[in-house]
């Protein structure tokens, strides 16, 4: 089960989608419909996302958390009071980045533990170039 994203398939009618993961800031949540960045609004305490129009039937809808990796959300100052909320934010940022890394790795092509061959996990592989060497993978287009 993913901890940092949720995926839906558009039905041409639904505009509201549940956000089933936690996040620190709303800016850390993004939505794509068929891979195109899409704007949305959050309601119900940030657990429901609403799109302005319903994704088409069969469209791939993804809401994904991307916690800031380039900027620390907590800055500790020497001599300042150490607050629980600062510790929680700092810990949560690191925890969320770990979850996101694990989720991203779960979507990657992996080596099978049974035969040490690449395993696409029953997903299509797209955007493959035509082969140029004898042992390259051949695309359907190349073979037709």
Where are these regions (language model features)?
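Right-handed beta-helix
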Residues: 120-132
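Polybasic "coupling" helices that flank or enter modular domains
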Residues: 107-116
